[in-house]
């Protein structure tokens, strides 16, 4: 089902979770608006969106792909990964910074070759929420990040 057709479910929800979708839409605000119409008053929406900061290395990869004229085909993805592994792309000399998705063909396509990608800053996220009269409740951080932010000793990260 297309997210913009979610009203066709003819249901409203207490909680809506949307991850990995809005940032690939032509107009994420339009997608969010469609979801809000299916949310009960006082309900919650949990969003998973791309971060401008967190994806800085992915942006470098996407720029390299564009410069090389590579396509999101299996051959194009393999050629890109081969160039990274062979050290031909100096900005991307460390594949682990691209994450585990880099090593799977379908995941790498979504990671680096997707035709539509919006990335959010805290300011643009707040603007999106304000435009839709939503209240920001907080970020859900991975445990590893929580350890970094809540503990000053590097030894606790081992």
Stretch-by-stretch model annotation:
Residues 12-14, 32-34, 52, 60-66, ...:
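Short secondary-structure boundary/capping segments
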Residues 9-10, 27-28, 57-60:
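Short, solvent-exposed loop/turn and secondary-structure capping segments
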Residues 13-29, 45, 51-53:
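A short SAM/SAH-binding and catalytic strip from SAM-dependent methyltransferases
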Residues 29-44:
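A short glycine-rich, Lys/Arg-flanked "PGG" loop and its adjoining helix->strand segment in the class I
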Residues 44-95:
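Conserved class I S-adenosyl-L-methionine
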Residues 4-16:
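A short acidic, Gly/Pro-enriched loop at the edge of an enzyme's catalytic core
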Residues 80-158:
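Rossmann-like AdoMet/SAM-dependent catalytic core
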Residues 14-15, 41-47, 133-138:
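Beta-sheet entry/capping signal
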């Amino acid at each position: 089902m297309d997210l913009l057709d979610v009203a066709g479910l003819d249901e409203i929800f207490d909680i809506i979770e949307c991850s990995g979708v809005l940032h690939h839409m032509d107009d994420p605000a339009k997608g969010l608006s469609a979801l809000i119409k299916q949310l009960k008053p006082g309900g919650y929406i949990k969003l998973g969106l791309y971060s401008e900061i967190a994806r800085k290395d992915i942006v470098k990869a996407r720029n390299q792909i564009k410069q090389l004229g590579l396509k999101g085909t299996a051959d194009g993805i393999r050629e890109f990964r081969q160039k990274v592994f062979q050290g031909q792309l100096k900005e991307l000399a460390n594949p682990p910074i691209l994450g585990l998705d880099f090593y799977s063909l379908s995941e790498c396509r979504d990671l680096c070759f997707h035709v539509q990608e919006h990335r959010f800053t805290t300011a643009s996220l707040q603007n999106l929420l304000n435009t839709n009269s939503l209240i920001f409740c907080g970020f859900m951080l991975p445990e590893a990040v929580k350890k970094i932010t809540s503990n000053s000793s590097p030894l606790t990260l081992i």
